[in-house]
C-alpha cells in the first residue's frame, strides 16, 4: 500500500505507541484520525500533525462507528492501528482475596473487545473501498504484548486480553481475505511508554538491561516503523510479530 493520501485510524493515539505511529503515518502523507479517551492530549497531537481527533471508548459500538464515519468523510479509509489499552496488575489470589472480577472484565472489554470492535467496524467500511491495483482494500494492525506468551505474576487479566488478540489474528485475516483486507498483530516487548516512565529510574534501567539486544527500552518509533512496513508489504497477513529484542519474561 502507498500510504500517502490514504486515511488511517489510530486508537490510543494521544500518547505512547499510538502517538508515535500517528506522527509517522502523517509524515508519510497520511490523513490520520486519532481515537482516544484523552481529549486534551489527543486534540493536541491531532492538531500538531494536521489530523483529526474523536473522543472514543473503543469498546463502544456508537463511539467506534463515529470514528469510522469521521475517517470515511476524509477520504479512503485504508488503515487501522489498534493501540488503545490498559494494563492492570493483580494476582489471582492476593492478600485481600481473589482477583476482582470487575477488573478482569474491564481489561478484556477494553483490550480485546475494544480491538475487535474497531476491527469489525473498519473492515465493514474498507470492504466497500474501490480496490488498489493489488486488490487490497485495507490493512489492520492490532497491539498484543509479549505478555500474551510470557505472562508474569499479576498479569492474568492482561495476558488473557492480549492472548485473545493473538488468537484472533489469523481467523480474522482468513475471514477478510476475500475482501482484500489484511490483518496483522504486533506484540511489543518492554517499551518506553508513559506507563513505564512512571516507574523509578532504577527499575527502568533494570528492565532495559534485561533485553538481550539491543539492551534498551523499545521506542514508539520502533513500533511505528514496523507498522509502516506492514502497511507497505502486501505479503504480511495473518501473523503476529514479536518486537522485543529477543527478551523472554521471567515469572516476576
Regions found by a protein language model. Give the residues of each.
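Catalytic Tyr-X3-Lys loop
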Residues: 78, 86, 97-119, 140-141, ...
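Conserved mid-core segment of classical short-chain dehydrogenase/reductases
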Residues: 86-105, 124, 128-136, 154-157, ...
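Catalytic Tyr-x(3-8)-Lys segment
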Residues: 109, 202-222
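Alpha-helical segment proximal to the catalytic Tyr-Lys
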Residues: 124, 173-175
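Residue(s) in the substrate-gating loop at a strand-loop-helix junction
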Residues: 145
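Short, small/polar-rich loop/turn modules that mediate ligand/substrate recognition or access, typified
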Residues: 177-182, 236-239
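C-terminal substrate-recognition "lid" of short-chain dehydrogenase/reductases
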Residues: 219-243, 248
Amino acid at each position: 500500500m502507498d500510504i500517502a493520501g490514504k486515511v488511517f485510524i489510530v486508537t490510543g493515539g494521544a500518547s505512547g505507541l499510538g502517538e508515535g505511529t500517528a506522527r509517522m503515518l502523517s509524515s508519510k502523507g497520511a490523513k490520520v484520525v486519532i481515537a482516544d479517551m484523552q481529549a486534551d492530549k489527543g486534540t493536541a497531537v491531532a492538531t500538531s500533525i494536521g489530523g483529526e481527533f474523536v473522543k472514543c471508548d473503543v469498546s463502544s459500538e456508537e463511539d467506534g462507528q463515529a470514528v469510522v464515519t469521521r475517517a470515511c468523510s476524509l477520504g479512503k479509509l485504508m488503515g487501522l492501528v489498534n493501540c488503545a489499552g490498559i494494563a492492570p496488575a493483580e494476582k489471582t489470589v492476593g492478600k485481600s482475596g481473589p482477583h476482582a472480577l470487575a477488573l478482569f472484565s474491564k481489561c478484556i472489554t477494553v483490550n480485546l473487545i475494544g480491538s475487535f470492535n474497531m476491527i469489525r467496524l473498519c473492515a465493514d467500511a474498507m470492504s466497500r473501498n474501490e480496490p488498489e491495483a493489488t486488490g487490497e482494500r485495507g490493512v489492520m494492525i492490532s497491539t498484543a504484548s509479549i505478555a500474551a506468551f510470557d505472562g508474569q505474576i499479576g498479569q492474568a487479566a492482561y495476558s488473557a486480553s492480549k492472548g485473545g488478540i493473538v488468537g484472533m489474528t489469523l481467523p480474522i485475516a482468513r475471514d477478510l481475505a476475500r475482501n482484500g483486507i489484511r490483518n496483522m498483530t504486533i506484540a511489543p516487548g518492554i517499551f518506553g511508554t508513559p506507563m513505564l516512565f512512571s516507574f523509578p529510574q532504577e527499575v527502568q534501567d533494570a528492565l532495559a538491561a534485561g533485553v538481550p539486544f539491543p539492551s534498551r527500552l523499545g521506542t514508539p518509533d520502533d513500533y511505528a516503523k514496523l507498522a509502516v512496513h506492514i502497511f507497505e508489504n502486501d505479503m504480511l497477513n495473518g501473523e503476529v510479530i514479536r518486537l522485543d529484542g529477543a527478551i523472554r519474561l521471567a515469572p516476576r
